[in-house]
């Protein structure tokens, strides 16, 4: 697994040199999509995935996703099962995430059919394993010919990923442990605006 870390925090990671197998880029306060624009040409593997800084991706689970995609060229993306954990007073509480979608698949033969299937699915595809070609094409579409961003709202960026992934191909949730996510107060999981609000709110209407 090759790891790219485009870090937009104020201060660089002091121990980056201790990890020569990781490509580390310090880009303080740079917009998420602009960081992606820089790293897209660096992705040399056939598949790619996000791993948030409060997540623990499971290598064996990733291997199961890539094996599935190798065998199913009509699928663009796949992910497994998630577990959320919360440290509390010396103990750790665990609970499954997206339990209603343990076996979810989006298998329509056309992009329109797949988008209609996805309409009521609240489990995001953002952290799934996806084909690199699809990943690069979807994010190339986020920029105008002059290099400026078509939109800046990161809630919309996740919704854009969900739709674009299904335009490129089918999706599967596979029965493998894929990722552990720490529940942290103030994390994105607590501040993310629901899709239902994004689709109907005047605040987001123009970009949506």
What do these predicted ranges mean?
Residues 200-208:
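C-terminal, non-catalytic tails of nucleotide-sugar-dependent glycosyltransferases
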Residues 1-200:
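Nucleotide-sugar donor-binding/catalytic module of glycosyltransferases
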